[in-house]
Structures are given as C-alpha cells and as structure tokens.
C-alpha cells in the first residue's frame, strides 16, 4: 500500500528540523509540493508565529557556518540572496567587520603554509582571498599579520 502524501506543514517541519532556513528559501522548497488550496504564505506565517522559522536565527546560523572561510562581502551577498535585508543585515555587518582581517589571516595560513616568496605568489594569494569575499583592507592587514605568530616559539 502506498504511503499517503506528506502534508505541506509536515514537509516544512522536516526541512526546519535539519537546519535553519530563510523564509524565501523555505517557500521555494515547498512550492513544488503545494496542492490546489494550499496557502504557503499562511503556513510560513504560522511557522514564524510558532517560532519554528526565524530570520534572525537563520542569519546567525549562516554567518556562523561561513565566517571561518569567507569574507564579509561573500557572506552579506549570500544573505541578500536568501532574502535577508534591513536591520538584520546592518547588525550582522557591524559584527562581521570587527574580525574580518583576523579571519582573512587564518584562511591565508590554512591555505598557504609559508609567506609569499615573490610578487607572483603574493598576487595569487591575494586573488584567493578576494575570491573568498575579503575586502582589500582586510587582505593587506592579513598579509602583515598572518605569519608573525610562526616566528614565536612560544
């Protein structure tokens, strides 16, 4: 006997149980399964009122997952792509800006084991950080501080 189809509400809760989703992302995932008469907007409203769906939690989760590997520009662009805007972005932007140079230095040390020997290698390493979304200022600071700790035997 075939299984009965999963309701839209159950499917939404299943998605949210695995990880946080933005409102836009969840609506996109649920749209192909919506039957005639299903109201995705009402379901999303109910999920937000029940605190199953939260833009703040999603934003914090995405930043936490991406901050160790990517720069502010990349993270903020990804948040915009998920439909996060307004005050939530402004708060996260301020938090992210504080440690971007340090994060860039960590990414640089993780990828490249030694400081650049020549201009070509330095340009390659700078392009790598730019592709990861780090600002020019943060990249400059990262090159100044990335390998200072290695000289210290302590």
UniProtKB/Swiss-Prot annotation:
It is found in: Cytoplasm. This is Regulatory protein RecX. The lineage of its organism: Bacteria, Pseudomonadati, Pseudomonadota, Betaproteobacteria, Burkholderiales. It comes from the Bacteria. One of its GO terms (biological process) is regulation of DNA repair. The gene is recX. HAMAP family: RecX. Coiled coil: none annotated. The keyword Amino-acid biosynthesis does not apply. PANTHER family: REGULATORY PROTEIN RECX FAMILY PROTEIN. Its main location: cytoplasm. NCBIfam families: PRK00117.2-5.
